[in-house]
Amino acid sequence: MSIRKRMNVLFGTLLLTGSLFSQNVCVSTPETSLVLSAPVGGELKHVYYGDKLSEVDLQNINLTGTPDMPAYPVYGLNCPGESALAVKHADGNMTLQMEIVQVKTSKEGNAEITAIELKDKVYPFYVNVYYKAYQDADVIETWTEIRHQEKKPVILNQFASAFLPIRRGDVWLSHLYGSWANEGRLCQEALEPGMKVIKNKDGVRNSHTSHAEVMFSLDGKPQENAGCVIGAALCYSGNYKLRIDT
């Protein structure tokens, strides 16, 4: 069994390319760097996203004490926050503990793909996390592929296309909502503690109600001509749910 879900993530002024340094995966643009900790046999973690790092910075980033977070958190042994993936194995166990099997990079047209394969420590259950970095646009495409080789079906209780931690601060969310003949209404709101959910269960008619696109303003209320933003959009139609946990 396999499942593939996909999301486009637009990092304002962000064009992602991939390179490996030691146990870290560095996905860089001309102006920014995204660093993931990816030791084989260890947990995939998000280390840094911000201004582009030099080679010296990359060599010393593990010495800075920069806090890291799971890059694709699963429900299991330690899950204080929202999980990207939660399953129920055939024997009733609901625990996952994923470790990195391998990291691969490849090129596809004008894009570079970083593929990180994860496997549960006990069960033959696998997750591949992909980052596809386009070279001619400030966009990366990220998605997950889920598969297993267990003898009986595995129930997927929750499975996300992607997960992105954002540092807390004066962060605002912009998104579109509406109804028939009143589509595309803009909502801008400060992120408060708790869970924000944007969802649509209207099949392919997503433009009528809540849209599957969001933008995070990282430095306060959105402005027309200035600011640091991260945008994300699902690249398929249909029912969806975007969860923002603060």
Predicted features along the sequence, with ranges:
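Bacterial N-terminal signal peptides
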Residues: 9-19
